[in-house]
Amino acid sequence: MLIWLAELSDHIHFFSTHFRFLNLFRYITFRTGGALFTSALIVFLFGPRIISSLRVRQGRGQPIRADGPQTHFKKAGTPTMGGLMILAGIVVSSLLWADLANVYVVATLLVTLGFGAIGFYDDYLKVTKQSDKGFSGRARLGLEFIIAAIAVYFMMNTALSSGPAGSTFGSSIAFPFFKSFMLNLGMFFVLFGAFVIVSAGNAVNLTDGLDGLAIVPVMIAAASFGVIAYLAGNFVFADYLAINFVPGTGELAVVLGAVIGAGLGFLWFNAPPAAIFMGDTGSLALGGLIGTVAVATKHEIVMAIIGGLFVLEALSVIIQVGFFKMTRRRVFLMAPIHHHFEKKGWTESQVVVRFWIVAVILAMIGLSTLKLR
């Protein structure tokens, strides 16, 4: 929204001569920093009030898994739905600092709010029923897929229209380590993109099981994709690195700046012992947001590297469930895999910090693919 002030100075001589500082709003880097600080400030200021309100309204808070580690029972009574704080920071900050005429920004916010609403309803059912069983799995996935498909459709059409006539770039998948090889999926790209976004949302959701475990890797992924979005949206940098130039995606760096700021604010309250959990409200929204940016920038496969920790968590659940159905035995002591390490004797802080380290290493590997071609 603030970028419009800079555009206003192009048409009104008074603004262009007396308010030259408005030109700062043209720069993505400046607005990214502004979005970061704004979202962090929003969460810091309103976080305590939101936590107090949720604690009163929820009573017993988020239910604790009966088969989980014994150390988790001391967390009983901790309120959930802390994702509301994160969403408030991201959305308000993005509305202020991002270009709302940008299709990629609108699509990303659509997925973020849509997935956040689904997660909120899931959290609401869990709290009111005092059960870890919330929204019907199939219904939830169906709604997520519809929202994601709508976003991907509009992003794909935007990419197709911004390219040369006859270009299939918008409906194609790019591969790391290859300069020009792309696989055109046609309209099936909508299904592929939606699958990526839904998978990302649920992978982050599965990771959110310990204090601070999910939010820091999310910020690491957001920072990584902030760099990717900025480079992919800049022709000079994209040409130099031989990555796909996607006009308009640089604006997503502003939204990702808001994610980092909101994440920092939330971590202040989520640091162990957590005063609040983000719940599905936050984890689904954040994962969906990262997935949408990956699809927009044509770095879906790179996301599997940068977000490898989330992939590992999701795979551990898939393997555990699948193997148990076939053999009635378990591969892990408990899934997702962070609980497996708790059962092995790692303290919660050891699991969290070591997983953070893994997330940093994977992000560095993922970013290195931008140059290794």
Swiss-Prot record:
Pfam families: Glycos_transf_4, MraY_sig1. GO terms for cellular component: plasma membrane. It catalyses: UDP-N-acetyl-alpha-D-muramoyl-L-alanyl-gamma-D-glutamyl-meso-2,6-diaminopimeloyl-D-alanyl-D-alanine + di-trans,octa-cis-undecaprenyl phosphate = di-trans,octa-cis-undecaprenyl diphospho-N-acetyl-alpha-D-muramoyl-L-alanyl-D-glutamyl-meso-2,6-diaminopimeloyl-D-alanyl-D-alanine + UMP. Its cofactor is Mg(2+). It is a multi-pass membrane protein. It comes from the Bacteria. Pathway: Cell wall biogenesis; peptidoglycan biosynthesis. This is Phospho-N-acetylmuramoyl-pentapeptide-transferase. The lineage of its organism: Bacteria, Pseudomonadati, Pseudomonadota, Alphaproteobacteria, Hyphomicrobiales.
